[in-house]
């Protein structure tokens, strides 16, 4: 396989005042959790470690990677509603915000990937892409109206709206259960250590997944495929594959590209808990999956919802969601429709 050369992109200019303005709602919490994660190392037991790793898979694999990312953001597959809600609760316990916030940020990332407006592009620095955008930045300071523009589907779901408002509740309940079962030691490992590992696993996809690795597809961003990022993120490290074909539930497109979340989705299909699965495979140039809304190859998004929930049926969910009735937004929407998007070419 020939590796496609990464794009040479100019840095995104982030307002320096914004970069220096600490998010006091987030920074102290992250500091506390990192202190707790370090403290857990002094109270090590194998039982506590295995509990932490199991919860890491439940919250990071089933929750973030499979539910927040592939199910809610990209609608790569569907599940019964009760199971979708269960997976969402698992994701919320990862301490990465409620479903409306997480999905809105990720859809915006795909809309502006490595361009002005991307919440966490490494074009403004590796640290910014990893955690700087969380500790400072404006990505987590989104009002309800802004969120609804990016997630009109989730905004109509009362459960997702409620869970976004009370997203700390599942973590509090989990902590209480762990304390009742195994005392403070189990809380240190099952809450603090597990959460910190999960946070950095997510952040490293945003940073390393756009810096180091190989590029099978010539996408118009800097996304890369990275095997070790894929291992810690349950398959999301095949990031160039994902940016080439966002609607695909399968990120590891080759047999040797380990994608644990894809294996889980396949198992769920066998037991009747997953259906309408979009399985992207390299075939010279990628084509939109059956049922996908007409869009550019880079932002294809299959929506099970009526087109009336979208601002424009001709654009992807996270592309058209930023439009409103203002003249400037209408001009931007027309420009997006006319934008020249050459076919993706797979490098073998």
Give the label of every model feature segment.
Residues 1-203, 248-332, 336-348:
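Non-catalytic, topology-defining segments of multipass membrane proteins
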């Amino acid at each position: 396989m020939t590796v496609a050369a990464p794009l040479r992109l100019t840095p995104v200019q982030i307002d320096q005042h914004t970069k220096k303005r600490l998010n006091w709602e987030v920074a102290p919490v992250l500091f506390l959790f990192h202190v707790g994660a370090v403290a857990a190392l002094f109270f090590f037991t194998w039982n506590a470690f295995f509990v932490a790793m199991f919860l890491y898979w439940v919250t990071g694999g089933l929750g973030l990677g499979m539910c927040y990312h592939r199910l809610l953001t990209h609608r790569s597959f569907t599940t019964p509603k009760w199971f979708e809600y269960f997976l969402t609760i698992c994701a919320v316990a990862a301490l990465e915000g409620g479903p409306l916030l997480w999905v809105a940020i990720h859809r915006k990332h795909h809309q502006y990937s490595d361009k002005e407006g991307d919440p966490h592009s490494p074009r403004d620095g590796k640290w910014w892409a990893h955690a700087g955008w969380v500790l400072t930045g404006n990505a987590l300071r989104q009002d309800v109206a802004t969120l609804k523009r990016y997630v009109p589907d989730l905004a109509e779901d009362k459960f997702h709206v409620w869970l976004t408002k009370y997203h700390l509740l599942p973590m509090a309940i989990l902590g209480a259960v762990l304390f009742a079962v195994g005392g403070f030691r189990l809380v240190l490992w099952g809450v603090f250590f597990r959460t910190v590992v999960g946070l950095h696993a997510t952040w490293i996809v945003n940073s390393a997944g756009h810096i180091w690795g190989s590029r099978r597809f010539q996408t118009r961003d800097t996304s890369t495929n990275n095997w070790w990022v894929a291992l810690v993120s349950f398959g999301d490290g095949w990031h160039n594959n994902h940016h080439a074909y966002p609607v695909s539930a399968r990120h590891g497109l080759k047999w040797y590209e380990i994608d644990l979340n894809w294996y889980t989705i396949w198992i769920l299909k066998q037991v009747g808990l997953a259906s309408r699965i979009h399985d992207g495979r390299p075939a010279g140039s990628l084509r939109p999956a059956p049922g996908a809304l007409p869009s550019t190859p880079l932002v294809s998004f299959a929506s099970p919802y009526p087109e009336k929930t979208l601002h424009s049926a001709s654009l992807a969910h996270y592309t058209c969601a930023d439009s409103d009735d203002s003249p400037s937004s209408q001009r931007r929407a027309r420009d997006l429709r006319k934008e020249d998007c050459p076919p993706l070419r797979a490098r073998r």
